[in-house]
Design a protein with these regions (language model features):
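Cytoplasmic helix-loop-helix junction between adjacent transmembrane helices
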Residues: 87-124
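Conserved MFS/SLC helix-loop-helix module at the cytosolic interface between two early adjacent transmembrane helices
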Residues: 43-82
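Extracytoplasmic gate region of multi-pass secondary transporters
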Residues: 12-13, 212-276, 326, 330
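Glycine-rich segments within core transmembrane alpha-helices of 12-TM secondary carriers
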Residues: 117-141, 162-163, 350-360
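Helix-to-loop junctions at the C-terminal end of transmembrane segments
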Residues: 44-57, 270-283, 368-369
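Helix-breaking motifs and short loop linkers at transmembrane-helix boundaries and internal kinks
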Residues: 24, 56, 77-83, 94, ...
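C-terminal transmembrane helical hairpin of 12-TM major facilitator-type secondary transporters
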Residues: 283-332
């Protein structure tokens, strides 16, 4: 599901040049349209996640994926800036609640002590989508027009259709909570439920469980600022990675750039496996998150200043860090929030954080124009990454319940 989600997020980056040629969209209009998705996505996040909490993941995840797949398919009909803006706004409404819904859903099933590595496995979806999605998008873009449909239109049609199919599959596959899992043996189910209930009670005693009061909790606001800056870093890479790689290769965005764009995400896949597991093993999520962001920030500074080899190496380090730090981050709010505060609070953090995806391309364009330097925007985003490393150093880190040690290893 997450692979398909990120395919949908990334295809707009691959379609940038084609949209500008076919639909007459300027750099500024592209940046605005790419970012508008996050406005409606943020507005509808909280109500969507509360609905999921009430009616269950199976039905709601199906609704989200089918609707966003249909809207994504509709992007093939973009004919100018206005239609591009409208479809990006509709896509934000359709996809709202997917990501925080998954984070909430995993908190129903996995205790604190193993949640980092579980979230790391979930986050495999991002680099996997870029590893396979980059070449796939490049191949589709390079297709000659068939039946009056150009390559970039085939890309949106094919990848949107995948979301519809996976959404229907999710309806029949997902179970809402462990208590509903008929495949889980009785003793294991009871042990898991006991651990999860003990942690829920601990969160109610020491964390926050009331919504909407959680929105004024200083820790939640701290988490939100951190996640906002993480998303600025992530989307600064996602939206511009294909065109930046094309620039230093001296190519147009197509098959070769698609394969080259997959290299940083192969590195990110390895990092997303190893870093969260290491953090869970040593229970040092905060320290590793600070280290990862600091290294990624310095790598981002090297990217625009280096040779093609150094630039590609810097992209590999930055992409790895920006993806791998996210499962570490989500262990903080999920160990602090309980009940409806978890549903609303996680959605709030993700909703405001997702606005980083709106500000990243626009901040990059502003900095490039203001300082009359193509790499100024990348330096700005790199600096914000280093600031974020400092913010994480002061984050509140929830405590695992000792009973979770008894859980079977994953």
């Amino acid at each position: 599901m997450y692979v398909v989600s990120f395919l949908d997020r990334a295809n707009i980056g691959f379609a940038k040049q084609a949209l500008q040629v076919s639909a007459g969209i300027s750099d500024a209009a592209y940046a605005m349209g790419a970012g508008l998705f996050f406005i409606t996505y943020a507005i509808f996040e909280i109500p969507s996640n509360i609905i999921l909490h009430r009616i269950g993941a199976r039905v709601w995840m199906c609704r989200i994926m089918v609707s966003w797949g249909l809207v994504s398919m509709g992007t093939m009909f973009v004919a100018g800036a206005i239609s591009f803006y409208i479809l990006r706004l509709l896509l934000g409404i359709a996809e709202a609640g997917f990501f925080p819904g998954i984070i909430l859903y995993l908190s129903y099933w996995f205790p604190n002590r193993v949640r980092g590595r579980v979230l790391g496995l979930f986050y495999f979806g991002a680099p996997l989508s870029f590893i396979f999605g980059g070449p796939l998008s490049g191949i589709l873009l390079a297709m000659p027009a068939k039946a009056g449909i150009q390559g970039w239109q085939w890309m949106f049609l094919s990848e949107g259709f995948m979301a519809v199919v996976v959404g229907i599959w999710a309806y029949f596959y997902l179970g809402d909570k462990p208590a509903d899992a008929t495949w889980l043996p009785g003793p294991e189910k009871q042990a898991l439920l006991a651990v999860l209930e003990a942690e829920e009670q601990a969160r109610r005693r020491h964390g926050s469980s009331a919504f909407p009061a959680v929105l004024m909790d200083w820790r939640v606001l701290h988490y939100t600022l951190i996640y906002f800056l993480i998303q600025m870093s992530v989307y600064g890479v996602i939206f511009y990675l294909p065109t930046e790689i094309a620039a230093f290769l001296g190519k147009t965005v197509g098959i070769e750039v698609g394969f080259a764009s997959a290299i940083p995400w192969v590195c990110a896949l390895a990092a997303t496996y190893w870093i969260p597991r290491t953090a869970d093993r040593h229970q040092n999520h905060r320290f590793l998150a600070v280290l990862v962001l600091a290294v990624s920030g310095f790598a981002s500074v090297l990217f625009p200043a280096g040779t093609p080899i150094i630039a590609l190496f810097a992209l590999c380090v930055a992409a790895s860090g920006f993806i791998a730090v996210q499962p570490l981050f989500w262990t903080f709010p999920t160990s602090y929030l309980a009940d409806t505060a978890a549903a609303g609070g996680i959605a709030f953090i993700n909703a405001i954080g997702a606005l980083g995806g709106f500000f990243a391309p626009n901040a990059k364009v502003w900095a490039d124009v203001h300082f009359r330097l193509h790499s100024a925007g990348l330096y700005l985003l790199a600096g914000l990454t280093l600031v974020n490393a400092v913010l994480i150093a002061f984050v509140h880190q929830g405590k695992s319940d000792g009973k979770s040690d008894a859980l079977l290893s994953i």
